[in-house]
Amino acid sequence: MSADEPMGFREITPPALAPMFGEHPPQSLDKDERYTPAWVFQGLGLVFDLDPASPGEGNGDCVPARRKLTKADDGLAQPWHGLVWLNPPFSNATAWSNRFIEHANGVFLGPIANGRWTHQMMKTADLLWLCRDFAFTHPTHSGKRSSMPLFFAAYGERAAGGLRRLAESARHEGVLVRQEQAAVDQYRRAEHELAEAG
């Protein structure tokens, strides 16, 4: 470990990664009310342009975003712009995650699932796994923990910088994975060729 690496973290680059979990996200809409704790945003040190899955002001929301879309706004159907924060509803993680991958500019917090989108993020985004779970916030049941392992994914230089800051400031041990651009480009070309051959 070099002197530049945060204590308790190790940085690796693919292909040292492999699919890790075969669990599926919970399907109950009741499970969707998980609000990210403030220390995550303090660690990231970013102001986002958009939170497309916001619980709304006064509902335990502490996301530093200039624009927030709630369930009533249907963030999946709206245009996304700039740096995006996404903690998606776990009951529909696939649709939200695919949209985030397509947008490719921002920070994602979600469950590790045995889905194509998880594998795609593992190959194309900078990643951070916190080895211990953490409590989400909620106005009526704060402290609720995820039954799923979670990870952060970042697309874009600003988002990746925020993820590195979070790794340095997190109170938990974890693993930070930084993608090499050449490997990302190669993966995207192969995906495009497969889609065209389809």
Regions found by a protein language model. Name each.
Residues 2-198:
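Class I S-adenosyl-L-methionine-dependent methyltransferase catalytic core
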